[in-house]
């Protein structure tokens, strides 16, 4: 829990199996929310949000944070991971103190803003003040909001560090520092920013990390800023492919994918679907081709203006747009309950991204279907994904319509 410059961590902090998985050292299970001794207003917010009983990660992950332990939680996207750390954070806040007590980092603006919405909903009866500090929004708004006082800040590394560095985000009263999607946050792109932020935090701050995947090399990085963490593991091959039917369609050549997608539209009644492409250019190209053939669809990627992206997400969540073509910008943590189908128009470059993509199609045990377009050049990549998750992806059957119903 202490700043590593003051107390160098030992190698015992994170146990890593030869498979690259963390070894769980915490097995206490809490069967119901009432048994966590939560404040009445927080419990009321949890039930009002629609939760009835905690999911597997919530049964294991909330209590160690409440008890003050640094915590590493590994669980699949869509299992209630966000609510795990949000519920714990809301319980630790002193609402009479008008100061930031929880700082939470996420890798993307969309994920940070979604976490803020979950926190405000769960903390509705607690009168929670939670602000999202993300790039692409007004710096002046951040300054004014932080100056007026908030209990919790959710943000992306660049903007959060900026607010810390300029003194607008004060962390004198910080109790809990959370990183969501820890694998992404600690990867090469964010590692330096995370360390710069951590150096500015109180020495005794409690740290929690949650993610669907935690590669071996990432776990070793956690020794630099965690002390004797409680480790909670959902084994990689159990990470969720349960409830999600996975298929592939052989398309031989890349240029045949478009016709294959059209064929699928003609045979499937799709309630709501996400189509993933590997590049922004590819998203634009596919969207243009679909619209030229009179198929209604939306598209979103990182080159778009932040406000435009928010409008597109609102339309998709409301159901006014039923097909969304996107890059991996959307793959981590976007909660769209109605999605019944995910199509990987392009197989992901990294096997670890696969679970984030198809996790959108079966949230909280809701059944979903994932269809992967596989060219001859993609066969090796498909086999890598199967090995990585210890799963088998079958060829799409003729009766796919029955499976979706």
Swiss-Prot record:
Record field: transmembrane: none
Example GO molecular function: ATP hydrolysis activity
Positions occupied by motif DEAD box: 180-183
Catalytic function, reaction form: ATP + H2O = ADP + phosphate + H(+)
EC number: 3.6.4.13
Statement: the UniProt record of this protein carries the keyword Manganese: no
Swiss-Prot/TrEMBL keywords: ATP-binding, Helicase, Hydrolase, Initiation factor, Nucleotide-binding, Protein biosynthesis, RNA-binding
Domain Helicase C-terminal, residue spans: 243-404
Domain of life: Eukaryota
Residue numbers covered by motif Q motif: 31-59
Residues that bind ATP: 75-82
Keyword Nucleotide-binding appears in the UniProt entry: yes
A Pfam family per the record: Helicase_C
Residue ranges occupied by any Helicase ATP-binding domain in the UniProt entry: 62-232
Main function: ATP-dependent RNA helicase which is a subunit of the eIF4F complex involved in cap recognition and is required for mRNA binding to ribosome. In the current model of translation initiation, eIF4A unwinds RNA secondary structures in the 5'-UTR of mRNAs which is necessary to allow efficient binding of the small ribosomal subunit, and subsequent scanning for the initiator codon.
Family: Belongs to the DEAD box helicase family. eIF4A subfamily.
Binding partners and assembly: eIF4F is a multi-subunit complex, the composition of which varies with external and internal environmental conditions. It is composed of at least EIF4A, EIF4E and EIF4G.
Protein's name in the database: Eukaryotic initiation factor 4A
Classification of source organism: Eukaryota, Sar, Alveolata, Apicomplexa, Conoidasida
Gene name for this UniProt entry: EIF4-A
């Amino acid at each position: 829990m202490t700043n590593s410059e003051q107390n160098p961590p030992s190698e015992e902090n994170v146990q890593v199996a030869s498979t690259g998985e963390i070894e769980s050292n915490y097995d206490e299970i809490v069967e119901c929310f009432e048994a966590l001794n939560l404040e009445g207003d927080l419990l009321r917010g949890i039930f009002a949000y629609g939760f009835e009983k905690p999911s597997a990660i919530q049964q294991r992950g909330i209590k160690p944070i409440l008890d003050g332990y640094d915590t590493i939680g590994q669980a699949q996207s869509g299992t209630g991971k966000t609510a795990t750390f949000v519920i714990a954070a809301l319980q630790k806040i002193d609402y009479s103190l008008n100061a930031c007590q929880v700082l939470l980092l996420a890798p993307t603006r969309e994920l940070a803003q979604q976490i803020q919405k979950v926190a405000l909903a769960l903390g509705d009866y607690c009168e929670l003040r939670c602000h999202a500090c993300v790039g692409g929004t007004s710096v002046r708004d951040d300054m004014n909001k932080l100056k007026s006082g908030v209990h919790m800040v959710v943000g992306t590394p660049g903007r959060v560090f900026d607010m810390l560095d300029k003194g607008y985000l004060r962390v004198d009263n910080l109790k809990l520092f959370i990183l969501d999607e820890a694998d992404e946050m600690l990867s090469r792109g964010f590692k330096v920013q995370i360390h710069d932020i951590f150096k500015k935090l109180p020495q005794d701050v409690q740290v929690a990390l949650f993610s669907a995947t935690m590669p071996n090399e990432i776990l070793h990085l956690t020794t630099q800023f965690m002390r004797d963490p409680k480790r909670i593991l959902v084994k990689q091959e159990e990470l969720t492919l349960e409830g999600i039917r996975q298929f592939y369609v052989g398309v031989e050549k890349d240029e045949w994918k478009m016709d294959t997608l059209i064929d699928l539209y003609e045979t499937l009644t799709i309630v709501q679907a996400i189509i993933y492409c590997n590049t922004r250019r590819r998203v634009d190209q596919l969207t243009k081709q679909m619209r030229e053939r009179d198929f209604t669809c939306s598209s979103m990627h990182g080159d778009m203006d932040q406000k435009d992206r928010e409008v597109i997400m609102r339309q998709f969540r409301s159901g006014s747009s039923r097909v969304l073509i996107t890059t991996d910008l959307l793959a981590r943590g976007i909660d769209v309950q109605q999605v019944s189908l995910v199509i990987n128009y392009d197989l992901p470059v990294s096997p670890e991204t696969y679970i984030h993509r198809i996790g959108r199609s079966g949230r909280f045990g809701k059944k979903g279907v994932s269809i992967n377009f596989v060219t001859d050049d993609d066969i090796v990549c498909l086999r890598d994904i199967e090995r990585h998750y210890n799963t088998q992806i079958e060829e799409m059957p003729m009766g796919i319509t029955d499976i979706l119903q």
